[in-house]
């Protein structure tokens, strides 16, 4: 690959470079010096308290969000196969399948985390797609054609529940020690691997 200046080699994605150097050092001891230098050049690991994990972050696995939804909205066991969180990398959109599976009698999704017009699953889906929930009514215009108008009161109520869901996620995400370790590691790998070049 040729020679590189130390300041260039010890900058950029130093985590990936360290993995490559460690692999090379397994068969060629000359690379041990690279491993040592790159180990010292690694960025400081961020801790959970320094990481802001938000609903809708595309780096979160759907399984994490599924677990949050299942635990927080207390989905009955017999319905867990029907209510799923999915992410499409093609459209960059989150979908909650089975939004109406629990029915209107579900107090948690229709009152605690939702409203009579937007249940918790609909609000979660909007939140995952980084949208503010909006509730519309259909009325007839002067020509008798249907027209959608924003229902300000219902929208305000739904947006309050949206904030309740965001707060619940912020409290939930770091509670489990294994989940915390996995998410911190994943975040550091994805977003804390780069070191700026320092010119000598």
Which residues fall in each region the model found?
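ASCE P-loop NTPase motor core, strongest for the SF2 helicase catalytic module
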Residues: 189-200
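Charged, low-complexity intrinsically disordered regions
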Residues: 1-186, 191
């Amino acid at each position: 690959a040729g020679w590189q200046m130390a300041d260039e080699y010890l900058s950029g994605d130093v985590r990936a470079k360290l993995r490559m150097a460690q692999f090379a050092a397994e068969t060629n001891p000359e690379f041990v010096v690279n491993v040592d230098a790159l180990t010292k050049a690694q960025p400081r690991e961020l801790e959970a308290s320094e990481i802001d994990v938000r609903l809708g972050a595309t780096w979160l696995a759907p399984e994490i969000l599924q677990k949050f939804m299942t635990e927080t909205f207390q989905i009955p066991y017999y319905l867990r196969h029907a209510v799923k969180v999915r992410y499409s990398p093609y459209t960059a959109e989150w979908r909650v399948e089975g939004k109406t599976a629990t029915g209107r009698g579900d107090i948690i999704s229709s009152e605690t985390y939702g409203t009579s017009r937007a249940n918790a699953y609909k609000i979660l889906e909007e939140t995952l797609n980084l949208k503010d929930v909006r509730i519309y009514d259909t009325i007839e215009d002067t020509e008798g054609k249907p027209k959608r108008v924003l229902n300000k009161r219902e929208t305000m109520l739904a947006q309050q529940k949206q904030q309740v869901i965001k707060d619940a996620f912020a409290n939930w995400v770091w509670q489990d020690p294994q989940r915390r370790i996995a998410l911190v590691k994943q975040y550091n790998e994805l977003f804390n691997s780069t070191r700026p070049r320092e010119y000598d």
